[in-house]
């Protein structure tokens, strides 16, 4: 267990909230808590006011986990926003483009009776942190650490307690009587979470997310070589007027794509029977292992400029990224996969069959269109692609007016992740229950942290018509992963 947790008392908690026909507000009528690594009985409070009274009576720094903080945390934030005693731990930011921009105070800079929270611009809830009575109370989302439904947690970790099913009957409200059956159900949920968290934390898996746990362990395995192999690409400056980006990280990130999901045209809204579903077991670790033969980029890139593909980029121990400008048309018998984001001319989620666009002046779709300025523009688009996607692009599409603008290449290595993967592969094969589940989590969640960028944009909560509302703040202060 890390030193951080030695200084804190950890709890698992859960709210039950009102659900009834015709309701116009939702309240907490049960708040259950259990202390980790302790045989102390669980406690149940009958309102959110009673819950905070209990929390404030506990000594020392506290970490309190809820399984899905986005739900339970909304009641906590609502309570804080409606309590004038507690103020936001933030400073205004002088930003002409964001009138209400703020920056969160660090823990050491927080004043008494203040709070802050981490909610991403995409609505992902991570923490709510309070400073009260000269100590910190942090509410965390255990769903980010243990990414399963609570019913699945019980099965995966083989906990002694199992999640029960129960439908509440009758009207519930803060302070209402709780039956013995309801109390058993409420406590059981917390016991399941408590047991799973004890397993995770006892094994040292105590970061905010499972991805962070994986990344931290991999860094420990690599030692000092990690910082040589995986340099911060956002600190590798390049001339924007020459390469279209300010840093190597920005340049490479433009090539980053999510998974491919496509419905073949003509097959929508039809029923097909006797279909086939295919899956690849442990796809990420199998591709990261040296057994796959895959080589991965390391270090800093070498750039080239001009309408050619550098011979150095094509060597066996290299991986390259390329920026091109072209018009394109899908070849017969091939599936589309190119998406163009950030342009009003294209739907960002559509896999395009061509770069042609609709021209309002002519009423037709073609290679040229009339802009708002009244001038004729061509539809040559700029794309940044990995060498893997570039080769696939040339295979799937015809190209016209094609031009290579520039590119960069990296040295590559094989077996970078073998020590990490072999460790958890062995545990997975030789273990059952919680240890096997943990091994699967660690095998499948390392990759994502390497893809993170500097975007740390977040949401700020406020009350609107007696309900929570949010506005976004743009920020780019997060430490990035190694995107290549």
Summary of predicted features, one role per range:
Residues 21-24:
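Short consensus segments that form the blades of beta-propeller domains
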Residues 8-19, 276-278:
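Two-metal-ion RNase H-like nuclease active-site motif
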Residues 1-4, 15:
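Replication-associated primase and helicase/ATPase modules
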Residues 4-6, 26-30, 36-68, 74-484:
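Conserved acidic
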């Amino acid at each position: 267990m890390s030193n951080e947790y030695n200084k804190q008392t950890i709890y698992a908690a859960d709210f039950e909230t009102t659900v009834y026909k015709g309701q116009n507000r939702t309240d907490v009528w049960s708040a259950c808590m259990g202390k980790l690594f302790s045989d102390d009985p669980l406690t149940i409070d009958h309102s959110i006011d009673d819950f905070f009274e209990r929390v404030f009576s506990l000594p020392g720094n506290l970490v309190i986990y809820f399984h899905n903080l986005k739900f339970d945390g909304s009641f906590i934030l609502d309570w804080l926003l409606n309590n004038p005693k507690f103020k936001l731990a933030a400073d205004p930011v002088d930003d002409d483009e964001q009138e209400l921009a703020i920056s969160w105070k660090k823990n050491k800079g927080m004043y008494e009776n203040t709070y802050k929270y981490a909610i991403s611009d995409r609505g992902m809830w991570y923490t709510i942190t309070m400073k009260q009575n000269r100590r910190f109370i942090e509410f965390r989302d255990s769903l980010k650490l243990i990414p399963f439904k609570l019913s699945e947690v019980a099965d995966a970790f083989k906990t002694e307690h199992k999640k029960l099913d129960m439908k509440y009957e009758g009207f519930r409200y803060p302070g209402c009587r709780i039956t013995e059956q309801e109390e058993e159900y409420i406590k059981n949920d917390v016991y399941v979470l408590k047991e799973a968290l004890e397993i995770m934390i006892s094994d040292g898996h105590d970061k905010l997310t499972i991805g962070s746990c994986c990344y931290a362990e991999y860094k420990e395995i690599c030692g000092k070589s990690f910082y040589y192999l995986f340099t911060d690409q956002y600190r590798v400056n390049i001339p924007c007027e020459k390469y279209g980006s300010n840093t190597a990280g920005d340049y490479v990130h433009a090539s980053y794509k999510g998974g491919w999901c496509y419905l073949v045209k003509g097959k929508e809204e039809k029923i097909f029977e006797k279909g086939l579903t295919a899956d690849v077991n442990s796809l990420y670790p199998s591709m990261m292992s040296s057994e796959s033969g895959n080589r991965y980029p390391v270090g800093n890139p070498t750039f080239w400029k001009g309408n050619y593909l550098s011979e150095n980029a094509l060597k066996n121990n290299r991986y390259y990224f390329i920026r091109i400008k072209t018009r394109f048309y899908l070849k017969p018998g091939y599936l589309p996969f190119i998406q163009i984001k950030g342009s009003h001319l294209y739907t960002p989620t559509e896999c395009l069959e061509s770069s042609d666009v609709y021209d309002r002046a002519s009423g037709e779709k073609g290679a040229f269109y009339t802009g708002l300025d009244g001038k004729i523009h061509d539809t040559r688009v700029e794309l940044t692609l990995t060498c893997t996607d570039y080769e696939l692009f040339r295979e799937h599409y015809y190209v016209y007016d094609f031009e290579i603008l520039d590119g960069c290449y990296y040295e590559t290595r094989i077996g970078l992740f073998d020590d990490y993967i072999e460790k958890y592969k062995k545990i997975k094969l030789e273990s059952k229950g919680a240890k096997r589940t943990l091994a699967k989590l660690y095998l499948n969640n390392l990759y994502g942290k390497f893809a993170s960028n500097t975007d740390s944009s977040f949401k700020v909560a406020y009350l609107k018509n007696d309900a929570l509302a949010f506005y976004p703040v743009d920020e780019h202060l997060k430490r990035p992963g190694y995107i290549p």
